[in-house]
Amino acid sequence: MKRPIVYTGCILFMVACLSAMSVHRQMAKPLKPDYPSYFGNRIFIPADNPLTEEGVQLGRFLFYETKLSANNRISCAHCHQQERAFTDGLAFSTGVDGTLTMRNSMSLANLLWIRNFFWDGRAQGLEAQAQVPLTDTHEMGQPLATAAEKLQKTKNYPALFSKAFGTPVITGDRILKALAQFERTLISANSTYDQYLRGSYHPTAAELNGINLFFTNPNAATNVRGAACAHCHGGPKTFSELFHNNGLDSVPKDDGRATITGQSIDKGRFRVATLRNIALTAPYMHDGRFTTLEAVVDHYNEHIQQSPTLSVFLQNNQPGMRGSQLGLTASEKKDLIAFLHMLTDSSFITDQRFSNPFK
């Protein structure tokens, strides 16, 4: 008769533990992301990882925690620096083994609206995205289990995990969830352009012409001037969750999306990056080949390379595309760049909620 009593006791203990975790989880304060209505509500927050104040705060600590790397010297912020709109100013970043990454570090602004991450879209969801740099041998180079063991031995992290998840047990899954929560709060929505949309800023003549060029399709037949940027970078968030070959090479040196899908039609296609804070995130493109906005505009204006998978919006059979040339004047290019500078959000790069908590 002893065994049933023991089993019953174990079951009751487990139920009590689960109940305590549930109550503690409910005690964590829900956090509603703050963003303008014109951003739209097509956001992505998994049901099993809701935003909470405690989870986001834990994620902030983890984002700047060097113990998550094999050499205890590299954190997520190593490649994603707040003052650079969470990029690092390099064409390719250096990991724990001194090896350069294969592609340019992307900005982390406004990830709340994204489902497929990295230039090639390999990761679905921020939780899956976070695991890649943490465990990649050429980036942070450490198994999640090892990272969890290191954090479990610290003085402060067990308590932080307990507040966020109900118990002090640290696991790789919880590390990923906390990081994802923090990164979903990195919202940039107070640029000069946002102030213009809200009616609190009056653009200069150059900025206004830049806005018009950005959102207008050119048509040589009707003498309509435009840069047609909005096909890929339309809407107030300045990106669409699509993959395009933007004419960098006639024969792509990097297969891009095709490395994931295995489809030849995806060769040379990469995820459309946000233009938010674009003036702060040089160098540009997946390989960091352009160091200035002037070089980027020149590329789209007159250096598009034809290839079988070139985006339909850049092909030379489109109205206004004069043999893959937009034909913007020097003055128009300056005005377009003036608009791109309007997308800089000074409050985003100085917001203490996103800053290094160890300083």
Please place each PLM-identified region on the residue numbering:
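Post-cleavage N-terminal segment of exported redox proteins
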Residues: 2-56, 114, 132, 141-219, ...
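Short glycine/threonine-rich turn/loop motifs
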Residues: 24-132, 194-299, 304-312, 352-359
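Mobile amphipathic helical/loop "lid" adjacent to a hydrophobic cofactor/ligand pocket
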Residues: 126, 137-142
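Amphipathic, soluble alpha/beta structural segments
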Residues: 150-168, 249-253, 257-258, 305-326
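Extracellular low-complexity, Gly/Ser/Thr-rich intrinsically disordered linkers
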Residues: 289-347
